[in-house]
A protein has these predicted regions:
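Aromatic-lined substrate-binding rim segments of carbohydrate-active enzymes
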Residues: 150-204, 309-331, 393
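Aromatic- and acidic-residue-enriched segments that line the glycan-binding/catalytic groove
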Residues: 158-173, 208-234, 271-302, 349-358
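Pro/Thr/Ser/Gly-rich low-complexity, intrinsically disordered linker/stalk tracts
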Residues: 477-515, 575-581
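Catalytic domains of carbohydrate-active enzymes, especially glycoside hydrolases
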Residues: 131-157
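Beta-strand-rich modules
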Residues: 554-571
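Active-site neighborhood of glycoside hydrolase catalytic domains
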Residues: 254, 261, 266, 275-341, ...
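Active-site-adjacent "subsite" loops/lids of carbohydrate-active enzymes
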Residues: 111-131, 202, 207-257, 261, ...
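Substrate-binding cleft of secreted/luminal carbohydrate-active enzymes
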Residues: 367-368, 372-389, 407-485
Length: 581
């Protein structure tokens, strides 16, 4: 749906964008023809034709000349549509006619806070932590998932060696104490995930400084010890004050450090911005204690600065969210930035019948603004309610978030798979199956994320087994992010290879030279009559093992093999097709 850069076809894309200043809707139709890799006998030809037709709703009021221009534009549009309808008969097309593999983001969150998913308890030996890590990755592979979202910063701490924050107590049992010598858990997560063909997204909590499950004393280098003026106590929590510029700068520095040092595929933040309200014993909501930062802001505010405290809080969060995306892309343009907010939108924008908590008013998260302005590459709203729950109806919320996706980014809703448990109120696996089926049938979301890994690793009520046999029976590639490409981007060249057959039954395809530096996966498609089958392998597996292909499989003779690389943006490179018949 959002992979026009990869498609060799005649496409039309209808977009509608709301002007964020005056609220006027401007409609336009963008027609794009992209004929790429047309000839198999000479270097690929890249040609593109783009035409924009602007339809101005105020044209009639500006006189007949404008109306005549609009009429001519519409006439030309109809002519172009007729041309597009016949473009398939021009004999232009890719060198290979193989269908592209399906695209769907399939992931699970791996929570480290309170030892929810990994490690299973603090103080585990390194060997046991590694074994649990491998078990999670093996589960993801068996389910044909293609990504993991691993929590690397539970509460202003780290599951990796850091000069900015102390080791997390959820690893060793004591904050600031390394879980083992020469052991970098994040580096191992990245290496193992990539070897298994999985993306690894690093999940940060942007403001939380201490969780109620913590038992260890704060380490001397924890932010609350070094810069106590940046951290406030709120109920059982310690929280970085979003109104303190140095607190936001610290979080940004932590994220930038990880992006620079680790080969991650995504930066991910969850729904904890300003904290969820804490209530007193009497049941009243306690105010968040940010008087000092608010008064400091008011003392220096100019005439046009914000007067409302809620608006100021939302702007504090806005600025950090926008800065995380910009900083991430400035360091590594291909690293995706995603947010997983609470699943309900602003009360004044919600569909009729939707009720519940307002993150806009309580967490000061203006998620619709981030989504509509394209500040995030993907949104994973936590749709943690069953389909039949009317006040938080899953399909209605899906349509709501999809309808606000003006920039054509990825929508990967979060699913509450951990509601499947041993209790009497447990969900049944069918609920998750129906939700995934609904997402696919809608055509408006190209992925989903399970909360959390434990439910799938433990195969609660058989949910993992059922998914593997039905909805995840066939693999899928991660959707591409073509909007992240730099101006000098070029598609990866076709794979260099050697092809030879071992008798009449088996052939081999071996790598010739090194894989391109930007290659993440090699996609191989085999064709036997009308049937095509694809698989993807990592560049390291391709270099070390090559690929063996049965010439005759299930009585069908191999006719052609097509290979292409995927780059860091998930975009398919030039194809090479080997024809046997």
């Amino acid at each position: 749906m959002r992979q026009l850069a990869e498609r060799n076809a005649c496409n039309s894309l209808f977009l509608q964008e709301k002007n964020p200043i005056d609220g006027i809707f401007t409609k336009f139709t963008l027609f794009q023809i992209d004929f790429a890799r047309i000839s198999a006998s000479k270097p690929a030809l890249d040609a593109a034709f783009t035409m924009k037709l602007l339809t101005d709703s105020s044209c009639v009021s500006r006189g007949s000349a404008c109306a005549r221009r609009a009429l001519l534009q519409r006439f030309f549009c109809l002519c172009l549509l007729a041309l597009l309808a016949g473009c398939a008969g021009l004999g232009l097309g890719p060198a290979s006619t193989e269908a592209d593999p399906p695209r769907e983001f399939r992931a699970m969150w791996v929570a480290t806070v309170a030892n929810i998913d990994w490690p299973s308890r603090p103080g585990l030996a390194v060997a046991e932590q590694r074994a649990e890590m491998r078990r999670i990755i093996d589960t993801a592979r068996a389910l044909r998932l293609n990504a993991l979202v691993v929590q690397v910063r539970p509460a202003a701490d780290a599951i990796y060696p850091s000069a900015l924050e102390p080791w997390s107590e959820y690893l060793s049992g004591t904050q600031g104490v390394a879980p083992g010598a020469d052991y970098d858990p994040l580096a191992e997560w990245v290496a193992l995930a990539h070897a298994a063909g999985l993306e690894l997204h690093a999940w940060f909590n942007p403001y939380r400084a201490r969780h109620p499950s913590a038992r260890s004393a704060l380490a001397p280098d924890h932010l609350a010890q070094r810069r106590p003026e940046l951290v406030v106590r709120y109920g059982e929590l310690l929280w970085m004050d979003p109104g303190e510029p140095d607190a936001a700068a610290h979080t940004l520095a932590v994220i930038a450090d990880v992006v620079r040092r680790y080969d991650i595929d995504g930066v991910h933040i969850d729904d904890y911005f300003y904290p969820y309200p804490v209530r007193s014993e009497a049941g009243s909501e306690q105010p968040f204690p940010d008087d000092a930062s608010w008064q400091r802001y008011r003392a220096t505010a100019g005439w046009f600065d914000l007067r409302d405290r809620a608006d100021w809080r939302r702007r504090n969060v806005d600025e950090l969210v926008q800065a995380i995306g910009r900083t991430t892309h400035a360091i590594k343009p291909w690293v995706k930035f995603g947010v997983s907010p609470f699943g309900l939108g602003r009360p004044d924008l919600r569909p009729a019948g939707i009720e519940g908590f307002s993150q806009y008013d309580k967490l000061y998260a203006d998620v619709e603004r981030w989504w509509q302005r394209g500040w995030v590459d993907y949104l994973a709203p936590q749709l943690y309610w069953p389909i039949a729950q009317t006040a938080q109806a899953f399909p209605v919320l899906l349509d709501y978030w999809a309808g606000a996706n003006w920039r054509g980014r990825h929508l990967w809703p979060g699913l509450f798979t951990s509601r499947i448990d041993a209790s009497d109120t447990s969900w049944q696996p069918e609920e998750i199956e129906r939700q995934i089926a609904l997402l696919r049938a809608s055509g408006r979301a190209d992925g989903h994320i399970h909360f959390s890994a434990a439910a799938l690793v433990q195969n609660r009520r058989g949910v993992a087994e059922r998914l593997a046999q039905t909805l995840y029976r066939d693999a899928a590639l991660v959707p591409a992010t073509p909007w992240l490409r730099p101006p000098d981007w070029q598609p990866l060249p076709a794979p260099a290879l050697r092809w030879h057959c071992e008798g009449a039954l088996r052939c081999r395809v071996d790598a010739e030279g090194a894989a391109p530096a930007q290659a993440t996966m090699l996609v191989i498609t085999t064709r036997r009559g009308d049937h095509s089958q694809w698989r993807a392998i990592t560049p390291s597996a391709w270099r070390s093992e090559g690929l063996a292909i049965d010439v005759n499989e299930h009585g069908a003779a191999l006719e052609a093999v097509t290979l292409h690389w995927l780059d860091r943006y998930g975009i398919a490179g030039e194809r090479r097709t080997l024809t046997l018949r």
